[in-house]
UniProtKB/Swiss-Prot annotation:
Family named by the database record: Belongs to the PTH family.
Protein name: Peptidyl-tRNA hydrolase
Subunit and partners: Monomer.
Organism: Burkholderia mallei (strain ATCC 23344)
EC class: hydrolase
Biological classification of the source: Bacteria, Pseudomonadati, Pseudomonadota, Betaproteobacteria, Burkholderiales
Gene Ontology annotations of biological process type: protein quality control for misfolded or incompletely synthesized proteins; rescue of stalled ribosome
E.C. designation(s): 3.1.1.29
InterPro entries the record matches: Pept_tRNA_hydro (IPR001328), Pept_tRNA_hydro_CS (IPR018171), Pept_tRNA_hydro_sf (IPR036416)
């Protein structure tokens, strides 16, 4: 069963529409669907809501610590409510998936994502669920003939808003991810994963 859903992003209006905040977008949508309001909760270092989703009580969290310190918020909430790593789902932007893709998986490394890296360090575990929301990679914007030796600026890319066509694809992927949330929250995470991946996400 999933008891805590964390959306990763950076705090502040200047980052709201940027690719790195895709995790926030998903949690914002979940809060809206539950009729819950995310409020600043200092003890959890983020915006927090306790929501009733699909018949289950679920904690929603958007760390306000900046991305590379997300673990501080996650571990504070997980310890307070005695939530195990395997009961946590972290939604985050994923450079290695194109816009329009979303994948669910348990465990493994951070893939260079500083938010995941910090969460794993604070939890002393990588065994939590990740919802990877594809944002594409800046190398994809470089013509193939010019890619050899090119060094795409990843930091600049994730801190910029997606193009309109990319945003539409990302929004569609988030909708597909939301459609499998009832299954995931009830603990049928493997089934949710199969549904999400089968639906072309």
């Amino acid at each position: 069963m999933i008891k805590l859903i964390v959306g990763l992003g950076n705090p502040g209006a200047e980052y709201t529409a940027t690719r790195h905040n895709a995790g926030f977008w998903l949690v914002d949508q979940l809060a809206r669907e539950a009729g819950a309001t995310l409020r600043d909760e200092r003890r959890f270092h983020g915006f927090y809501a306790k929501a009733r989703l699909f018949g289950e009580e679920v904690h929603l969290l958007e760390p306000q610590t900046y991305m590379n310190r997300s673990g501080q918020a996650v571990v504070a909430l997980a310890h307070f409510f005695k939530i195990l790593p395997t009961e946590i789902l972290v939604a985050h932007d994923e450079l290695d998936l194109p816009p329009g893709a979303a994948k669910l998986k348990l465990g493994s490394g951070s893939g260079g994502h500083n938010g995941l890296k910090d969460i794993s360090a604070h939890l002393s575990s990588q065994q939590y669920w990740r919802l990877r929301i594809g944002i594409g990679h800046p190398r994809d914007l470089i013509p193939e003939s010019a890619r050899a030796g090119a060094k795409p600026d990843v930091a600049n890319f994730v801190l910029k808003p997606p193009r309109k066509d990319e945003q539409d694809l990302i929004d569609a992927a988030i909708e597909r991810a939301l459609a499998v949330m009832p299954t995931a929250i009830k603990g049928e995470t493997e089934r949710a994963m199969m549904q999400l991946h089968r639906n072309g996400a």
